[in-house]
Amino acid sequence: MKSAWELALERSGGALQELSPEKKEKIAELERAAQAKIAAAKITAEHKLATMTDPDEIDQLKEGLVNEIRFIEESLARKKEAVRAE
């Protein structure tokens, strides 16, 4: 009986592609840059949040932060996939 991993491997067309050290480093750099952008967005939002009193504005700021983080993460995923496809 085959494991789920073996079945998935067969369906995907073979062995998983091993990444070269250069590609691994590119991906690591992309991840570091994305984490830095997320950290900067959080810090900026925290500073703005400290001066806000209107609950609606606070909700908008939090929603904007969530959207910005999602955009950064989606962009990271696309860039990582492009590196893997090279």
Regions found by a protein language model. Give the residues of each.
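Soluble, non-transmembrane alpha-helical interaction regions
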Residues: 1-86
